[in-house]
A protein has these predicted regions:
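Alpha-helical tetratricopeptide repeat
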Residues: 9-12, 16, 24-32, 52, ...
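Repeat-mediated protein-protein interaction surfaces in helical alpha-solenoids
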Residues: 7-18, 129-134
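Short helix-capping/linker turns of helical repeat alpha-solenoids
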Residues: 20-23, 36-38, 43, 56-59, ...
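Hydrophobic face of amphipathic alpha-helices that form TPR/SEL1-like repeat modules
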Residues: 29-36, 63-72, 101-108, 148-155, ...
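TPR/TPR-like alpha-solenoid signature
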Residues: 28, 64, 85, 100, ...
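Terminal, low-structured helical/coil segments at or just beyond the last alpha-helical repeat
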Residues: 172-195
Length: 195
């Protein structure tokens, strides 16, 4: 066995040991490792098990990830009400990706009654948030939430239609390198609003 492989085994053993001892950080780490196949085979059920243990101890990433797993049905049955609960717990801690998912749930009526105004509020909070610890989250507010706000302005859902406001939010997301924002700029002809 090479040193790198031995090192990987030692790291995994320590993560498992600390997770089994109840450390919420290592439980979340182990769950993420199983989810992504990082040093272990992908196993969504094991990922769900460890992430749920960590979320029960209010680890912010785990609460978000558990919400996502209920949202997507990975490692468990799809359950939008439970997804909403866990996204809400993480959103209360000002976690932008969870705030964005709450916006999507209100916009689409998944797990809650459809409410464009409430969706707008959550997208706005997420778009301006600086707490984005997730691997998938942006560093200057959630670019996904910024694009969702732009779509609300383009479609006039919960807000008056406004190309200018849509352009403002797409510009912020585009500045973070969002591919979705780049597609929106072309599709909705928002080039005049891009810095």
């Amino acid at each position: 066995m090479s040193y790198k492989n031995q090192s990987d085994c030692n790291h995994l053993s320590k993560v498992i040991e600390k997770a089994e001892a109840g450390d919420k950080i290592f439980q979340s780490t182990l769950g993420t490792m199983y989810y992504q196949g990082d040093g272990v085979s992908i196993d969504y059920e094991k990922a769900f098990y460890w992430i749920k243990k960590s979320a029960a101890q209010e680890h912010i990433n785990a609460m978000y990830n558990l919400g996502y797993m209920y949202w997507s049905g990975e490692g468990t049955s799809e359950d939008y009400e439970k997804a909403f609960y866990w996204f809400s717990k993480a959103a209360e801690q000002r976690f932008a990706p969870a705030q964005n998912y709450l916006g999507m749930m209100y916009r689409d009526g998944r797990g809650v009654d459809q409410d464009f105004e409430e969706a707008f509020v959550w997208f706005l909070i997420a778009a301006n948030s600086t707490l984005s610890c997730s691997i998938l989250a942006g560093k200057k507010g959630s670019s996904e939430a910024q694009c969702n706000l732009a779509l609300m302005y383009i479609e006039g859902n919960g807000v008056p239609e406004s190309q200018e406001e849509a352009g403002h939010w797409v510009n912020l997301a585009y500045g973070q390198g969002s591919e979705f924002a780049a597609e929106m700029i072309d599709e909705y002809e928002l080039w005049d609003y891009i810095d």
